[in-house]
Amino acid sequence: MSAVAAMSWWQVISLAVVQGLTEFLPVSSSGHLAVVSRVFFSDDAGASFTAVTQLGTEAAVLVYFARDIVRILRAWFDGLVVTSHRNADYRLGWYVIIGTIPICVMGLLFKDEIRSGVRNLWVVATALVVFSGVIALAEYLGRQSRHVEQLTWRDGLVVGVAQTLALVPGVSRSGSTISAGLFLGLDRELAARFGFLLAIPAVFASGLFSLPDAFHPVTEGMSATGPQLLVATLIAFVVGLAAVSWFLRFLLRHSMYWFVGYRVVVGVVVLILLATGTVAAT
């Protein structure tokens, strides 16, 4: 691998589209960025590029869930002042806060490993295959009988802990949170919506934390300029908005078994490419 390679506009646009398409699907956006970067461009875009472009996809979540977010915030602040107004939305606000704590703690503790070692393609491919089994098991065992009024702080904590698994590229943030929700008996749409709401503070914090690093000179991998990062973030926003809308409609009628099969195929193909020396792991 070369020391530093400047990213072309074609690479920037391609990876931004990949980020937007895969951020909300249970297939791992960070894993796909690592795979696409190395298989097609022979180098890694890096964790900072991933984190900054995630700001675009998370902005898409803000737009898509704007009414829900405003309603929850109003209920939360209202409930702090008037105890008799503490409804399901007030409690949901607390569950998001509780669920955000685990990934913030783990992200700070293992930030160096996240930026380097775990982006190894052996890790990514293995996680794609292994965690597909977890998703399949969640679909098989999930009762899907609980609704938003039945959420508890324990649900927020469990889904929040599950979200920390997404720090490993190849696992998938939506895959881990939706699976946790299904194991807890939540219906599929609620598990997805709660997982997306839970991701907002964590991903924005990660993106803002990595923003200064993205503009500093790098010593290895691919390097994007400021204008390239801006364009990539905007593309990720547009594509991500379309993706989250499609995915939530998809979950109303379909299970995640489709994505289980996809993950296994991609993971096995990458493992074969690694085993034959066609692609470098780092």
Swiss-Prot record:
One of its GO terms (molecular function) is undecaprenyl-diphosphatase activity. The keyword Transmembrane helix applies. It comes from the Bacteria. Disulfide bonds: none annotated. The chain crosses the membrane at residues 90-110, 121-141, 165-185, 194-214, 228-248, 256-276. Signal peptide: none annotated. It comes from Mycobacterium marinum (strain ATCC BAA-535 / M). Catalyzes the dephosphorylation of undecaprenyl diphosphate (UPP). Confers resistance to bacitracin. PANTHER family: UNDECAPRENYL-DIPHOSPHATASE (PTHR30622:SF4). It is a multi-pass membrane protein. Bacitracin is thought to be involved in the inhibition of peptidoglycan synthesis by sequestering undecaprenyl diphosphate, thereby reducing the pool of lipid carrier available. InterPro entries: UppP. HAMAP family: Undec_diphosphatase (MF_01006). GO terms for biological process: cell wall organization; peptidoglycan biosynthetic process; regulation of cell shape; response to antibiotic. It catalyses: di-trans,octa-cis-undecaprenyl diphosphate + H2O = di-trans,octa-cis-undecaprenyl phosphate + phosphate + H(+). This is Undecaprenyl-diphosphatase. One of its GO terms (cellular component) is plasma membrane. Keywords: Antibiotic resistance, Cell membrane, Cell shape, Cell wall biogenesis/degradation, Hydrolase, Membrane, Peptidoglycan synthesis, Transmembrane, Transmembrane helix. Belongs to the UppP family. Coiled coil: none annotated. Pfam families: BacA. Its main location: membrane. Its EC number is 3.6.1.27. It is an enzyme of class 3 (hydrolase). The keyword Hydrolase applies. It is found in: Cell membrane.
